[in-house]
Amino acid sequence: MSVFIDKNTKVMVQGITGSTALFHTKQMLDYGTKIVAGVTPGKGGQVVEGVPVFNTVEEAKNETGATVSVIYVPAPFAADSILEAADADLDMVICITEHIPVLDMVKVKRYLQGRKTRLVGPNCPGVITADECKIGIMPGYIHKKGHVGVVSRSGTLTYEAVHQLTEEGIGQTTAVGIGGDPVNGTNFIDVLKAFNEDDETKAVVMIGEIGGTAEEEAAEWIKANMTKPVVGFIGGQTAPPGKRMGHAGAIISGGKGTAEEKIKTLNSCGVKTAATPSEIGSTLIEAAKEAGIYEALLTVNK
């Protein structure tokens, strides 16, 4: 089992003829992802990297049976691409694009309410189910199949955590990058619920950062519902108030959203937190040993 995607997921790439999309399409195909279609308006009928290109998402879905799309479309047009995917009733749309205007995303979020399409992102690295399906921009080779779920607001910290786990012989089920923007689709609790219900996932790494209250809300949900150990890390511990740290959503405002507050809440809800990024792997091992599941997590031959 895994969450959201697996080896049978049929994927379309929106904006496939752009240079960034082409590069990552090849990487995803090399990983074994079933990319069955691309979409670029006005370029239907072309074939790139062996993938047929269509003018619309609807046409691509009807012709190929794709159920998930990944968006590599420039920021001014990305919101419309998400809406088009939702109108086609895709199961999930993963938006990699950064710098989408906040008001665009507010409209998108409102539009998606009550619809079946799940949005992951924007401004995220994507979703990967180890050794099965990679949708996004993450380095595939560091991910190995196992029993730890990863959910994160940060792309590069996800890679750091996954690499540490793999080096320790601990594989992963699925890693989900939910993105660093203030208005996004899938949140921590959505992914934690999925991991909690997934038989293969035995423990979870959750990586947050300053800004907003998503981590605090997730911590309360974990305390009330989670049946598996969760370890956390919060980025931005040295950030001064009012200074945006990389992501649009990573800003402390009105005294809220500090790393200190988030860490305190996580710890009070039973989530062990790593003090630095380099300790994420060892913190998970510590929690796994306490839960008596450490041996079960050792799935990677070192």
From Swiss-Prot:
A GO BP term here is: tricarboxylic acid cycle
Q: Which GO terms describe its molecular function?
A: nucleotide binding; succinate-CoA ligase (ADP-forming) activity; succinate-CoA ligase (GDP-forming) activity
Q: Which residues bind CoA?
A: T17, G18, S19, T20, K43, I96, T97, E98
Active site feature: H247 (tele-phosphohistidine intermediate)
The residues the entry assigns to the signal sequence are none
The catalysed reaction is: succinate + ATP + CoA = succinyl-CoA + ADP + phosphate; GTP + succinate + CoA = succinyl-CoA + GDP + phosphate
InterPro entries according to UniProt: Cit_synth/succinyl-CoA_lig_AS, Citrt_syn/SCS-alpha_CS, CoA-bd, CoA_lig_alpha, NAD(P)-bd_dom_sf, SUCC_ACL_C, Succinyl-CoA_synth-like
SUPFAM superfamilies (UniProt xref)? NAD(P)-binding Rossmann-fold domains, Succinyl-CoA synthetase domains
Q: What class of enzyme is it?
A: ligase
For this protein, the Enzyme Commission number is: 6.2.1.5
Q: What does this protein do?
A: Succinyl-CoA synthetase functions in the citric acid cycle (TCA), coupling the hydrolysis of succinyl-CoA to the synthesis of either ATP or GTP and thus represents the only step of substrate-level phosphorylation in the TCA. The alpha subunit of the enzyme binds the substrates coenzyme A and phosphate, while succinate binding and nucleotide specificity is provided by the beta subunit.
Assembly and interactions? Heterotetramer of two alpha and two beta subunits.
| Name of this protein | Succinate--CoA ligase [ADP-forming] subunit alpha
